[in-house]
């Protein structure tokens, strides 16, 4: 499979709910407002910036801090084992390539179409896993409740109400076939949308800024919830740090 086919698969796999969009392009094929050489900041601004050689970011809370929604054992395995594995394999893939390892992981996945073919699969899968999980940990915390301020207004404007948004994101997350993620994203034009990505694909690859992400890989919930993904997704909303999510939304608006 060549690079063009690989990127086309990622673009085709992003399922948007409540919006019909296309990735805007200039006549020369470069992206407008996306993550290209002159636009990558719009996505990276909404995330932290772990740089290479890549390291596992510490959890910003204790393993048991999200009980009873996420159990301590799952959090330990999810962070220390699964996420660490993505970091290790990404480092192995970019070893000896300072042109790659000097870039943030978000920059790598945002510019996947510019990656060397030899490293493309590893950056897509392992880099995506590192980027997605680094983002996830920052948006969880004791909280629940509901968003406020500008994010609440944007959600109401797009989805009608917070409860309607919850229903749509839940349906998207529960409906992912196999492993993947459900996302609330900010599109290049500023509109919110819900989309899903398979495996560890990132919204950044298609120029979308992640605001909130639900990991529906079984390793995220199977120890506690077994095959009851709907119960896990319901519990997820009680573990969202809406202040952190609102900050990412605000950062995305500035970029």
Model-identified regions with their sequence ranges:
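All-alpha RGS (Regulator of G-protein Signaling) helical domain and cognate RGS-like helical scaffolds
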Residues: 49, 69, 81, 92-102, ...
């Amino acid at each position: 499979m060549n690079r063009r086919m690989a990127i086309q698969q990622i673009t085709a796999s992003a399922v948007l709910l409540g919006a019909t969009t296309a990735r805007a392009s200039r006549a020369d094929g470069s992206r407008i407002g996306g993550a290209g050489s002159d636009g990558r900041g719009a996505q990276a601004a909404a995330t932290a910036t772990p740089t290479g050689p890549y390291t596992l970011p510490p959890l910003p809370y204790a393993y048991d801090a999200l009980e009873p929604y996420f159990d301590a054992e799952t959090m330990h395995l999810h962070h220390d084992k699964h996420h660490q594995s993505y970091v290790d394999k990404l480092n192995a893939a970019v070893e000896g390539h300072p042109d790659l390892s000097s870039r943030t992981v978000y920059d790598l996945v945002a510019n996947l179409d510019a990656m060397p073919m030899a490293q493309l699969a590893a950056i897509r899968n392992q880099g995506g896993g590192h980027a997605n999980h680094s983002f996830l940990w920052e948006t969880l915390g004791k909280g629940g409740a509901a968003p406020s301020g500008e994010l609440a207004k944007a959600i109401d404007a797009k989805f009608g109400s917070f409860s309607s948004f919850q229903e749509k994101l839940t349906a998207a997350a529960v409906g992912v076939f196999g492993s993947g993620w459900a996302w609330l994203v900010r599109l290049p034009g500023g509109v919110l949308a819900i989309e899903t990505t398979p495996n560890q694909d990132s919204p950044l690859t298609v120029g979308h800024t992640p605001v909130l992400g639900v990991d529906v890989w079984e390793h995220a919930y199977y120890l506690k919830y077994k095959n009851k993904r709907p119960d896990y997704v319901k519990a997820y909303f009680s573990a969202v740090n809406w202040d952190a999510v609102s900050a990412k939304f605000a950062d995305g608006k500035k970029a």
